[in-house]
């Protein structure tokens, strides 16, 4: 289990426990004030507070880690939620309703949540705004503090943007997944790419990586990414490889 490479500050809190559940949930919180990531870390460093989060985001867009991902933070007033969730505290530019955050903090939040989902195998971020779906991560894998305690957290500003957050994170995950797609045989390719790749294979331009072949005797280890395939097709269509 890894931690986010996006952090620029680490101040590990003693207020945490061993995680016993796989990470499959995201819980976004608000700091209820415009605290820096250093100030938030100092608060969580106090054992008497018995509170922490995995990450924190300041109004300047910087990201800190307070509890490593392999540990459960004490953040959401619910140990079962925190055992499966990555918790993120976001600074507020106004310490009252609707508890807004800066553009820089919101942009950093999108980056961080995308990274967390990608590294932990969360294929899609799901939000219905339905408390009854807590724990049903195939239907909803975002939760909020207000569902577990009498609090406004994460504030209406962020709460009302959970659907937007999910949509943008999913858009980014789709792009990342497509970039990671690899094709080893001509049969696996999308139809629009098969003529070009077949031509290049038959011409000996593409030979595969290790000598494996498919039923037609063509390479079965082409190891072509989506981007590589698109580039080859573009080159073919403008005549670089001849007719």
Which residues are covered by each model-predicted region?
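Sec-exported extracytoplasmic/periplasmic mature domains
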Residues: 68, 114-122, 170, 174, ...
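Extracytoplasmic/periplasmic, Sec-exported soluble proteins
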Residues: 18-20, 47, 76, 80, ...
């Amino acid at each position: 289990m890894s931690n986010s490479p996006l952090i620029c500050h680490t101040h590990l809190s003693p207020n945490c426990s061993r995680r016993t559940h796989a990470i499959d949930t995201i819980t976004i919180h608000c700091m209820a004030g415009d605290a820096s990531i250093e100030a938030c870390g100092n608060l969580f460093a106090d054992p008497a507070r018995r509170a922490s989060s995995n990450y924190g985001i300041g109004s300047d867009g910087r990201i800190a880690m307070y509890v490593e991902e392999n540990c459960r933070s004490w953040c959401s007033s619910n140990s079962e939620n925190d055992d499966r969730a990555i918790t993120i505290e976001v600074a507020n530019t106004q310490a009252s309703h609707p508890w807004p955050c800066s553009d820089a903090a919101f942009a950093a939040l999108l980056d961080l949540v995308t990274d967390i989902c990608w590294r932990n195998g969360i294929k899609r971020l799901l939000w219905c705004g339905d408390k009854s779906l807590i724990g049903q991560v195939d239907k909803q894998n975002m939760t909020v503090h207000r569902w577990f305690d009498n609090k406004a957290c994460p504030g209406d500003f962020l709460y009302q943007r959970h659907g937007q957050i999910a949509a943008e994170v999913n858009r980014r995950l789709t792009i990342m997944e497509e970039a990671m797609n690899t094709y080893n045989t001509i049969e696996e390719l999308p139809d629009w790419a098969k003529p070009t790749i077949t031509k290049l294979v038959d011409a000996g331009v593409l030979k595969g990586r290790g000598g494996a072949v498919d039923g037609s005797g063509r390479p079965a280890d082409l190891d072509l990414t989506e981007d590589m395939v698109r580039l080859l097709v573009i080159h073919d269509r403008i005549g670089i490889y001849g007719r």
